[in-house]
Amino acid sequence: MPLKWKTSSPAIWKFPVPVLKTSRSTPLSPAYISLVEEEDQHMKLSLGSSEMGLSSHLQSSKAGTTRIFTSNTHSSVVLQGFDQLRLEGLLCDVTLMPGDTDDAFPVHRVMMASASDYFKAMFTGGMKEQDLMCIKLHGVSKVGLRKIIDFIYTAKLSLNMDNLQDTLEAASFLQILPVLDFCKVFLISGVTLDNCVEVGRIANTYNLTEVDKYVNSFVLKNFPALLSTGEFLKLPFERLAFVLSSNSLKHCTELELFKATCRWLRLEEPRMDFAAKLMKNIRFPLMTPQELINYVQTVDFMRTDNTCVNLLLEASNYQMMPYMQPVMQSDRTAIRSDTTHLVTLGGVLRQQLVVSKELRMYDEKAHEWKSLAPMDAPRYQHGIAVIGNFLYVVGGQSNYDTKGKTAVDTVFRFDPRYNKWMQVASLNEKRTFFHLSALKGYLYAVGGRNAAGELPTVECYNPRTNEWTYVAKMSEPHYGHAGTVYGGVMYISGGITHDTFQKELMCFDPDTDKWIQKAPMTTVRGLHCMCTVGERLYVIGGNHFRGTSDYDDVLSCEYYSPILDQWTPIAAMLRGQSDVGVAVFENKIYVVGGYSWNNRCMVEIVQKYDPDKDEWHKVFDLPESLGGIRACTLTVFPPEETTPSPSRESPLSAP
């Protein structure tokens, strides 16, 4: 069927071969030739005021200096000469005939062989056609053969929808790769809602991988609009299954996708054989119970096909156990988003020391912060961790208090699929200035402080039971420490014990419920951050005592090798940051906000460390200065609205 195209103008493609502007028979008069030597010993040949594209360079040898000249127009002259010989029927040594007519095309064997591996093998590989004067090319049409021959002799190709398929078929059969590339560009440039299905069919027929990928991308991006056209029902099973399984599919609810798939299945009876395979790509657990009962269970094959029945049972079980969902994740429960972002949460604002409840993500493409659903209550000095792309916020403080007397025990969980929060079981003890890690599907809250003082205790949260239980405590109480996980165990570094900054490193193994001492850091530090990249555990920033009542930023950084049990220094930070958020994004370390003791103020800076280059860079700023902020990475739906940046405030005195 003919394609509907968004332009009726033919595309003229030219191979990058220079065209000589003068007649081949016109001699170059010495009076008009000038050699211009440049400092780099390259030369240009000029004819009057027009450059002729000649160049030269010097080459030294034992025989003396040799000047080598190059003409950039020679290939064009030769090509024009061969084309003229073809048009005049001179020196042609073979005649090609298309498979659908008796038309004859006299050509030169050497030209065809130089442009096509197919013809090269035919004329030099001992095939019977090698000695034939007339060759019939079955499978190549008259239109296609003419286009191929014209291109070989002129380096130009004129394409429109009337000749595209013939040209594509001939180029594929005869292995004329530049023509195939032109056809790919032509197809991609003209894809619309009306012809995307047919373009995809052509791409599959001729194995045009780039075109097929583009059609997939186009259909994904425009799927909601495609659903309102008749073209949707013409999609082949493979492409529809790909679209339904993709995390890049946006702006469609799972119920809309289910209804559309049912329409596609019911168009033709044989399609019902694909019902179970397609339904595996619908994310039934993300539907509401009402949608499942009113719209899904009423469809006959969803009640009779065993696979479909199991899909409904899976959805029902998932929805009945909301606390367990982070450890029940599968392809059918994942968010339909293909973008992971740096996310920040809470913190205390420099202005009036107000605690924030904002949850934000940084849009790397738009270079701006965007707001997600805020917490019900503000938080700083809290712990955050991610299990199954669910964000947990644990403990911390709702009011500004440097002594931890207003610590809380509440725990909330953010679901990016719905941009909503829910409360889960509270800690056994209120705690702030502590560390939280996610390890093997559990949460571990380590140390900290509250109104009763410093804490050595460690609690473990089990999403399967929605309970916190105590595990082995630390040998000494710690607060302001940092932690990370590697190799199935948790590492805790530094912090403050009995008002003394530490440099120790401890390792907790959840399988044995024991703490093990490791090689200490080279520098004491607290309120720092820690993260894992590859097989290295990085310790960054923080502060320590300068005297009895004052503090200094710690700019030095180092990493720990669990395999060698040793520390190695790395490049120092550009600016001091304590009590920060830290996240690893695309193998780079982002240190977010915090407090600078040297400058006596909260900071809005975000610094990035590249482990491969051992370099620090300031990359962007927070919307406002925030201390006690936390950060992570999360796969989310980027919202449309941006976060406004408030005016800068003057630094406050140190807390």
UniProtKB/Swiss-Prot annotation:
Keyword presence, tRNA-binding: no
Location of the BTB domain: 92-161
Gene Ontology CC annotations of this record: Cul3-RING ubiquitin ligase complex
GO-annotated biological processes: cell division; protein ubiquitination; regulation of cytokinesis
Kelch repeats: 341-389, 390-441, 442-488, 490-535, 537-587, 588-636
SUPFAM superfamilies the UniProt entry points to: Kelch motif, POZ domain
Domain BACK: 196-297
UniProt-listed CDD domains: BACK_KLHL9_13, BTB_POZ_KLHL9_13
Keyword Cell division set for record: yes
UniProt keywords, alphabetically: Cell cycle, Cell division, Kelch repeat, Mitosis, Repeat, Ubl conjugation pathway
Molecular function per GO: cullin family protein binding
Pathway the protein acts in: Protein modification; protein ubiquitination
PANTHER family listed in its UniProt record: KELCH-LIKE PROTEIN 13, LD33804P
Complex formation: Component of the BCR(KLHL9-KLHL13) E3 ubiquitin ligase complex, at least composed of CUL3, KLHL9, KLHL13 and RBX1. Interacts with AURKB.
Biological function: Substrate-specific adapter of a BCR (BTB-CUL3-RBX1) E3 ubiquitin-protein ligase complex required for mitotic progression and cytokinesis. The BCR(KLHL9-KLHL13) E3 ubiquitin ligase complex mediates the ubiquitination of AURKB and controls the dynamic behavior of AURKB on mitotic chromosomes and thereby coordinates faithful mitotic progression and completion of cytokinesis.
Protein name: Kelch-like protein 13
Organism: Bos taurus (Bovine)
Originating gene: KLHL13
